[in-house]
Curated annotation (Swiss-Prot):
Disulfide-bonded cysteines: 105-110, 265-269, 308-341
PROSITE patterns: ASP_PROTEASE, PEPTIDASE_A1
Keywords for the protein's UniProt record, in alphabetical order: Aspartyl protease, Digestion, Disulfide bond, Hydrolase, Protease, Signal, Zymogen
EC code: 3.4.23.4
Reaction equations catalysed: Broad specificity similar to that of pepsin A. Clots milk by cleavage of a single 104-Ser-Phe-|-Met-Ala-107 bond in kappa-chain of casein
Matching InterPro entries: Aspartic_peptidase_A1, Aspartic_peptidase_AS, Aspartic_peptidase_N, Pepsin_A, PEPTIDASE_A1, Peptidase_aspartic_dom_sf
A single MF term (Gene Ontology): aspartic-type endopeptidase activity
Signal peptide (UniProt feature, chain positions): 1-16
Protein name, per record: Chymosin
Length: 381
């Protein structure tokens, strides 16, 4: 079955039928933008890192820590409405809702970004339902509607979209993306909302019910491919991992080792593959073991710094997933900027779940297979 998945997806790519490629560009991370404006220290003191919680309560309020997007750098273009209005979005496999700022939003974050004007779209329909997503200490409030969304060569009609009427604080003001397009399972979406990729599958707008992500380390050539697997972005074979909970793209990690010794995830743990999170996030105790093993030291904001001159002598961290080893070298798990190096590992106090973000995805081409509920991983070029 797994070989058939690859053969069909690659065949679809070779035929060029209904294959959608969305170039992803690497922009300035929110962390750097806040730092340039002297706002990073205050932000880090106020925010807490964590995994998105379930949707619950009246109005279907979601909770997504704002720090999830602090280091996100890979964005793409979509178009909403008729005639189309252009937006830059973060394609996020860690959430399921699709939203953009609207003209009804007066928050600073909205004023600094493209805002959708439903009055100028002949295909917009107001659903009349509220949308609320909590981000850190604030929340995005909005309304749900239907409209046509165009993603590369796909025209997706009657797509539910959230139009923000309020965005939290001033943090989103400095983000390079306007909105978020969630690509997780529909069980994670708010009530009345259908994820974009689900709508595409239901309308048979994609050749195969899967999508794949390649994140180039330099930022050039990164690509989201809908409906196909592109072998030109990886070497060797894809290895498949069963999704354990059809909510996030969640699976089992067998262990995390350094020099053959288990340093984290002993006995196995759950992880999600998340394009909307840059770092590798795990339980604080496990992450602390890793930070100590790689020689990282904690700074006053709780982040971990690394001596840039030590990279060549630092150990490789290995994730074992479904019996396959996925090594991360120091150059993969370390962020280098303006002479400073920081660890790509981040601790979380309130969760046993891991998040494998861009640090991992840059090293391993990732396939998200909805038809078979599998994640495919191969060494990226």
């Amino acid at each position: 079955m797994r070989c058939l998945v690859v053969l069909l997806a690659v065949f679809a790519l070779s035929q060029g039928a209904e294959i959608t490629r969305i170039p992803l560009y690497k922009g300035k991370p929110l962390r750097k933008a806040l730092k340039e404006r002297g706002l990073l220290e205050d932000f880090l003191q106020k925010q807490q890192y964590g995994v998105s919680s379930e949707y619950s309560g009246f109005g279907e309020v979601a909770s997504v820590p704002l720090t999830n997007y602090l280091d996100s750098q890979y964005f793409g273009k979509i178009y909403l409405g008729t005639p189309p209005q252009e937006f830059t979005v973060l394609f996020d496999t860690g959430s399921s809702d699709f939203w953009v700022p609207s003209i009804y939003c007066k928050s600073n974050a909205c004023k600094n970004h493209q805002r959708f004007d439903p009055r100028k779209s002949s295909t917009f329909q107001n659903l009349g339902k509220p949308l609320s997503i909590r981000y850190g200490t604030g929340s995005m409030q909005g309304i749900l509607g239907y409209d046509t969304v165009t993603v590369s060569n796909i025209v997706d009609i009657q797509q539910t979209v959230g139009l923000s009427t309020q965005e939290p604080g001033d943090v989103f003001t400095y983000a390079e993306f306007d909105g978020i397009l969630g690509m997780a399972y529909p069980s994670l979406a708010s009530e009345y909302s259908v994820p974009v990729f689900d709508n595409m599958m239901d309308r048979r707008l994609v050749a195969q019910d899967l999508f794949s992500v390649y994140m180039d380390r330099s930022g050039q050539g990164s690509m989201l491919t809908l409906g196909a697997i592109d072998p030109s972005y990886y070497t060797g074979s894809l290895h498949w991992v069963p999704v354990t909970l059809q909510k996030y793209w969640q699976f089992t990690v067998d262990s995390v080792t350094i020099s053959g010794a288990v340093v984290a995830c002993e006995g196995g743990c759950q992880a999600i593959l998340d394009t909307g999170t840059s770092k590798l996030v795990g339980p604080s105790s496990d992450i602390l073991n890793i930070q100590q093993a790689i020689g990282a030291t904690q700074n006053q904001y709780g982040e971990f710094d690394i001596d840039c001159d030590s990279l060549s002598s630092m150990p490789t961290v290995v994730f074992e997933i479904n019996g396959k080893m996925y090594p991360l070298t120091p150059y993969a798990y370390t962020s280098q900027e303006e002479g400073f190096c920081t660890s790509g590992f981040q601790g979380e106090n309130h969760s046993h779940q891991w998040i494998l973000g861009d640090v991992f995805i840059r090293e391993y081409y990732s396939v998200f297979d909805r038809a078979n509920n599998l994640v495919g991983l191969a060494k990226a070029i």
